[in-house]
A protein has these predicted regions:
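Glycine-rich phosphate-binding loop of ATP-dependent small-molecule kinases
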Residues: 1-260
Length: 260
C-alpha cells in the first residue's frame, strides 16, 4: 500500500472543518481532501441536496422560497439542513470536510453543540496576499454549489463544475473594495469565534506564505497552474505563485503526521 492509500485509510471517517478568510484557498484544499475520500459539505450543497431529495418538507419549502427570492436562508433553516446532511450515510462512513460553514458564531454554536469534529484546519494567509490574490487571480465559481476555480486552477471540463456539473461563472464581486469589505466581515463575524474552537483543542494552523524562491515572471502565469497573489513592493506589483501540487503535498504530510 503506497503512502496515499495509507493516508486515505487513516482519514476515513474523519470530520474536518476548513477555517479561513475569503480567497485563502479553501476550495483547493477541499479538492485535496475530497481526493482522500472525504465528502465536501458546504451550506449551498446541503441546501440544494435537501430541496432535490426532500422537496415537500417544510425546511425544503422555506429554503427554496428564500433562495428563489434572492435572500439569505436564516440560521434556523440552514443549520438543521447542514446537520441532517452530515448524518447521511456517505458522510458518516467516509467522513467530511466543512467548507466555509459555519460563518457566524450563532451558526457555530448551533452546529458544534451537535457535531464533534476531529480537526479544524485554520488556513492562515496574510491579508495583503488575499486582496491582491483575489483581485488578480480572476476567480471562478460554480453557480450551483459555489465550488471555487480560477484561470490557474480550472475545472477539468471548461465551464463545467468537477463536483456537481453546474455552470462555472466569473465572480463579478472580486474587486478590491468588495474584497476588503468581505475580509472585514470575516474578521468581525467568523474569525471572532475562532477562540471558541481553539478552546476545544481541535484547531491546527496551516500557514500559507510565499517565499522569495517561489517568485515567477508574469509572462509565465498563463502557462502555469497555481494560486497567484499580487503583492505591492517598492518595485511595483509582482506576481507570486503557490504551487498547487506543493500545497497538496504539504497538506497530506501534515495530515499524516497528525493522524497516522
Amino acid at each position: 500500500m503506497d503512502d496515499l492509500q495509507k493516508l486515505k485509510a487513516v482519514m476515513r471517517g474523519k470530520r474536518l472543518h476548513l477555517f479561513g478568510p475569503p480567497g485563502c484557498g479553501k476550495g483547493n484544499r477541499s479538492k485535496d481532501l475530497r481526493a482522500l475520500g472525504l465528502i465536501h459539505v458546504a451550506s449551498g450543497i446541503a441546501l440544494r441536496a435537501k430541496i432535490r431529495d426532500d422537496p415537500d418538507s417544510e425546511l425544503s419549502k422555506t429554503a427554496r422560497d428564500v433562495m428563489e427570492s434572492g435572500g439569505l436562508v436564516p440560521d434556523e433553516i440552514v443549520v438543521p439542513i447542514v446537520m441532517e446532511h452530515l448524518e447521511r450515510p456517505e458522510c458518516r462512513e467516509n467522513g467530511f470536510v466543512l467548507d466555509g460553514f459555519p460563518r457566524t458564531k450563532a451558526q457555530a454554536d448551533l452546529l458544534f453543540s451537535k457535531v464533534d469534529l476531529d480537526l479544524v484546519l485554520h488556513l492562515d494567509v496574510p491579508r495583503n496576499f488575499l486582496v491582491y490574490g483575489v483581485v488578480g487571480g480572476n476567480r471562478l465559481a460554480c453557480a450551483a454549489c459555489a465550488a471555487g476555480y480560477s484561470d490557474f486552477d480550472p475545472p477539468r471540463v471548461e465551464g463545467v463544475c468537477d463536483h456537481c456539473g453546474g455552470k462555472i461563472v466569473n465572480r463579478a464581486d472580486d474587486n478590491t473594495e468588495t474584497i476588503e469589505k468581505r475580509l472585514d466581515s470575516y474578521d468581525a463575524e467568523t474569525k471572532a469565534f475562532l477562540p471558541d474552537l481553539e478552546a476545544r483543542g481541535i484547531v491546527e494552523v496551516l500557514p500559507i506564505t510565499v517565499s522569495d524562491d517561489e517568485e515567477i515572471d508574469e509572462s509565465y502565469l498563463k502557462t502555469l497552474r497555481g494560486e497567484v497573489y499580487r503583492v505591492e513592493t517598492e518595485a511595483g506589483t509582482r506576481a507570486r505563485m503557490l504551487n498547487l501540487e506543493g500545497m497538496r503535498q504539504r497538506l497530506y504530510r501534515f495530515l499524516t503526521e497528525k493522524f497516522a
